[in-house]
C-alpha cells in the first residue's frame, strides 16, 4: 500500500469513527467509547493535514490550467506561476509531514504520567540534584499548562530528595517526557566541598504512563494492604487515626507507601494508582526486553540504568548522550526551558523510524 492509499484509509476510518461515536450502543459502552475516542483523536491531525494536502494538489492543478488559459495575459500568467511555485513548495512540505504522521504512534503518547525521581550515586549531592530535577520538571510542566502534583516525597537531612513520586496531567504529557527515563549525571562542586573539586553524582528518573483501572485490572487477591499511623519529622506519629497505606503487589513484590493525604481512603486511592502504573510498566518492560533490538525505541526509553544525560555546572553544559546533543544552556534548561532538548529527541526518534521504514 503506497502512502496515498494509507492516507485515504486513515481518512475513511476517521469518518467511520465519527459515525460510531454517535451510535447510542457505543456511547453506552464506556470502555469502547473511550477507546474509539482516543483512536479518533490520534488520527485527527493526520486527516486534517491530508485534507489540506489534497487542497494543495487541487491548487496546483488549477494554477496549471490558469497558465494554459492565460492567452497572452502577462499579469494573469505571472500570478498563476507564482501560485504554482507556492503550491509545489507546500506539496513537498506536506508530503514530509504526512510521512511522519503515518509513523506508528505510541498508544501512550496522549496519557498523563507518573514521574519518579531518586537520588542515586553520590549521597547528599545526588539527593540535592534530584531536587533540582524535580524543580526543572515542575517549571517545564508550568510552561506547558500541565498540572503537577507531588504524590509522595522523602527528604534527607540537607533538604535533598531521596525519592519523589509525582503525577503530571495534561495534553500529550507522555509524548514529551517519555525520553526522560534513565540516569541523569551531574558534575559540580558541592557546597560542602572546601577544595573546590568537581564531584560527579547521579539521580534516576522513571516516567510511566498513567494506567486507568479499565485498561489494566489488578486482582485484589494479588494485593496486600497494610494500614499504619503516618509519621512526621523525627519519626513521630502525627495522626491518632491510622491513615497511611502500604500496598504490595504479591506476584512482583512491587511496593508503594502513601501517607501524604489526611484520610486512609485518599492514600489508598493514590497508592493503587501508582502500583497499577508500576505493575503495568513492569510487565511492559518484560515484553519490550523480549522484542528484537531493532524494534526498541531508538532513543532509549527502555533501559532504566542507561546514562542518558550529563549536567556540567562549571561549563554550563548539558549533553544528551543518546543523540550527541550538547547545549551550553544548563541554567535555562534547569529553569524549565526544555523544549530544545525534547524537540531534538522527538525529531531524532522520528528520523530513525522513517529510515527503518524505508529500508
Swiss-Prot record:
Methylated by PrmC. Methylation increases the termination efficiency of RF1. The modification N5-methylglutamine is found at residue 236. Keywords: Cytoplasm, Methylation, Protein biosynthesis. Its main location: cytoplasm. One of its GO terms (molecular function) is translation release factor activity, codon specific. One of its GO terms (cellular component) is cytoplasm. It is found in: Cytoplasm. InterPro entries: PCRF, Pep_chain_release_fac_I, Pep_chain_release_fac_I_sf, Prokaryotic/Mito_RF, RF-1. NCBIfam families: prfA, PRK00591.1. HAMAP family: Rel_fac_1. Belongs to the prokaryotic/mitochondrial release factor family. Peptide chain release factor 1 directs the termination of translation in response to the peptide chain termination codons UAG and UAA. This is Peptide chain release factor 1.
